[in-house]
Amino acid sequence: DRWVWSGDAIQSYLMNYYLFFDSESVKRTIWLLRGKDPVTSHSNTIMDYTFYWFLSVYDYYLYSGDRQFVNQLYPRMQTMMDYVLGRTNKNGMVEGMSGDWVFVDWADGYLDKKGELSFEQVLFCRSLETMALCAGLVGDRTNQQKYEKLETTFWNASKQALVHNSINGVQSDAVTRYANMFSVFFNYLTPERQQAIKHSVLLNDSILKITTPYMRFYELEALCALGEQETVMQEMKAYWGGMLKEGATSFWEKYNPEESGTQHLSMYGRPYGKSLCHAWGASPIYLLGKYYLGVKPVKEGYKEFSITP
């Protein structure tokens, strides 16, 4: 798979910060994914991938402290966010419109993409936070206040979780892992709700399982953020170790331990359609650096940092 995908790239950047710290390749890729004005579609045509693009700027600034890059990129960030805000619905939320690909994940099971997905709103909110941060860095106080105001529920008390989506103002009964795990490591919920999500969603085998390294990245990060490093280590050994036992020499686009033989090679309706060397496959690099060695920037560019193994 040789195209540059925003959702894949953001994970590559995070791994890079703990392995090579090659800032130049990160900056080039962020610029490449943004493209030129006027904005006529989402990044890679995928709504969630536009939000990952904003988040990648947030992450890059945190790890590098490179304010000059933010200054250069900010006008393109503005026009990209203007495009997003021009496509919100009457509730001020994002949902798939004509020409949009609402991706989320390659799921083994039905994943409803209709209406207002809580997952997309969480990413949208984080993108607005990024815009507010960057507006402050470049001295754009007017727009900083606008973006902060736009930051704004999908919580279901009986399920002790964020529901998957809302259609025509009505909460669905479905609960998936996606919004719940992101809301944990974005620190959007009270400690009590985070613990509720850990038990009712993340450690609940009845919730639709994730079978891509792409989203296992975030699932395991949420568990690490909740102090479940021992559980995550077992999962890393079983999941990535499972690929190694199948003969992998690089990590795959998708891996379902319940499959066998050539089933592991098929995807997209093609018997050998799966990428076996995929950008989103190597999340243990990031998880081990951040949550096991415990190295994290507290302020931009490691002006302050914590090391808590």
Give names to the regions the model predicted:
Residues Y17-I30, Y61-M81, N89, A132-W155, ...:
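Structural helix-adjacent loops and short alpha-helical linkers that scaffold large soluble proteins
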Residues M233-P309:
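Non-catalytic C-terminal accessory modules of carbohydrate-active enzymes
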Residues W5, D22, V26, I46-W53, ...:
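Active-site-proximal structural scaffolding
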Residues M15-L19, S183-N187, Y286-L293:
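Short, hydrophobic/amphipathic alpha-helical patches that form generic packing surfaces
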Residues S206-E246:
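Repeat-solenoid scaffold signature
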Residues D1-G86, N91, E95-S98, P213-E219:
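Substrate-binding groove/exosite segments of carbohydrate-active enzymes
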Residues K36-Y52, L85-T152, N156-E221:
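The feature captures the catalytic groove of carbohydrate-active enzymes
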